[in-house]
UniProtKB/Swiss-Prot annotation:
This is Transcription factor YY2. One of its GO terms (cellular component) is transcription regulator complex. Its main location: nucleus. It comes from Rattus rattus (Black rat). It is found in: Nucleus. Belongs to the YY transcription factor family. Residues 36-109 are annotated as: Mediates transcriptional activation. Functions as a multifunctional transcription factor that may exhibit positive and negative control on a large number of genes. May antagonize YY1 and function in development and differentiation. The keyword Flavoprotein does not apply. A zinc finger (C2H2-type) spans 258-282, 287-309, 315-339, 345-369. It comes from the Eukaryota.
Length: 376
């Protein structure tokens, strides 16, 4: 006779239409336990080439992706419908300029190039998938320089964390964090400084204060009879250096309480906005001309330079019967002096009263005085 437990059986049905009297129930003698193993997660390893050939012509090539299954033995509710994705990426992708052009010319002294060892060409790091997509989709929003300077700074910071010193030849760059006063309080500002330019600030300040302004000798003032202290006007080399000195810009009457935070600069500005705009000149030249390889700090300077290669001349002389066109507004202003007769550049030698419309013509003329003395 069967026990009570063998006779007692329960059947649970939902929305069943068949009466229980027509269902024959059979007891189960043994329940077989089956262990379930399935691949519930995957690891995606993205190996990004961090060498100089990881991009070409400004286009990013998709990295190699290797899939490796991971076996999971513990399943919770709903785990079989989910996948865990881990993206391993090397660094953020930024705009790229032809690396061959980065070594051309002498105007690349301020650029920063990261040396990469052979072991660093394929090296994985770990990042979340959502963070990777945010870096890719929000790149332009995060960069105040249109994705160029900010992206390059990100790469250099990554190299600095790994012990790599960003340098180009003898250039050694160091990042400096400064605090700038804003409307909402102080905020940090990252600035790159060339270690080779570090000198004694006191000596630089004294030298800056003692340097006279010789530009007045190019616009009408005559040389004194005793000459200029420290300059031999009879020496062609010293005279050529004298003519190549840049004139100092006249300072306005408004106060300039904000000083440039870059070591050794010392320039003063009327507000923080003007100072922050000036700070860009101390950074790397990331805007490179694809035609000749010249590099510029600001994209606007690069666009103006590219007019030389394209042959475009948007500036036209408005004087009747002339109509000459120029690629730069500066050249147009200089050309207009031919029509107006304006000759602001006067020979500084006492016995000479020649005047010129362009400073370059005056500089060439000044050297003739030394040549004539040597011929006598």
């Amino acid at each position: 006779m069967a026990s009570d437990t063998e006779k007692l059986m329960c059947l649970t049905t939902e929305n069943a239409e068949i009466p229980a009297d027509f269902v024959e129930l059979q007891p189960l003698d043994e329940i077989e336990t089956v262990s379930l193993e399935t691949n519930v997660s995957q690891t995606i390893e993205v190996y990004g080439d961090v060498g100089v050939d990881w991009a070409h012509g400004g286009h990013y090539h998709s990295p190699l992706i290797a899939l490796q299954p991971l076996a999971g033995s513990n399943l919770s509710n709903g785990d079989h419908d989910q996948e865990m994705i881990i993206v391993q990426t090397r660094e953020e992708v930024v705009d790229y300029q032809d690396s061959d052009n980065l070594l051309l010319g002498t105007e690349f002294e301020s650029q920063m190039v990261l040396p990469v060892t052979e072991d660093d060409y394929l090296q994985p790091t770990t990042a979340t998938f959502s963070g990777f997509m945010a870096a890719e989709n929000g790149q332009d929003e995060l960069s105040p320089y249109g994705g160029n300077l900010c992206g390059l700074t990100t790469i250099i910071e990554a190299g600095a964390e790994e012990g790599v010193n960003p340098d180009l030849g003898d250039k050694q760059w160091e990042q400096k964090q400064i605090q700038i006063d804003g409307l909402d309080g102080e905020f940090p500002f990252a600035m790159w400084e060339d270690n080779n330019l570090k000198e004694d600030p006191v000596a630089e300040e004294e030298a800056g204060e003692s340097t006279p302004d010789y530009s007045e000798y190019m616009t009408g003032k005559k040389f004194p009879p005793e000459g200029i202290p420290g300059i031999d006007l009879s020496d062609p080399k010293q005279l050529a250096e004298f003519t190549s000195m840049k004139p100092k810009k006249p300072k306005g009457d408004f106060p300039r309480p904000v000083a440039c935070s870059h070591k050794g600069c010392g320039k003063m500005f009327k507000d923080n906005s003007a100072m922050r705009k000036h700070l860009h000149i101390h950074g790397p030249r990331v805007h490179v001309c694809a035609e000749c390889g010249k590099a510029f700090v600001e994209s606007s300077k690069l666009k103006r330079h590219q007019l030389v290669h394209t042959g475009e001349k948007p500036y036209q002389c408005t004087f009747e019967g002339c109509g000459r066109r120029f690629s730069l507004d500066f050249n147009l202003r200089t050309h207009v002096r031919i029509h107006t007769g304006d000759k602001p550049f006067v020979c500084p030698f006492d016995a000479c009263n020649k005047k010129f419309a362009q400073s370059t013509n005056l500089k060439s003329h000044i050297l003739t005085h030394v040549k004539n003395k040597n011929d006598q």
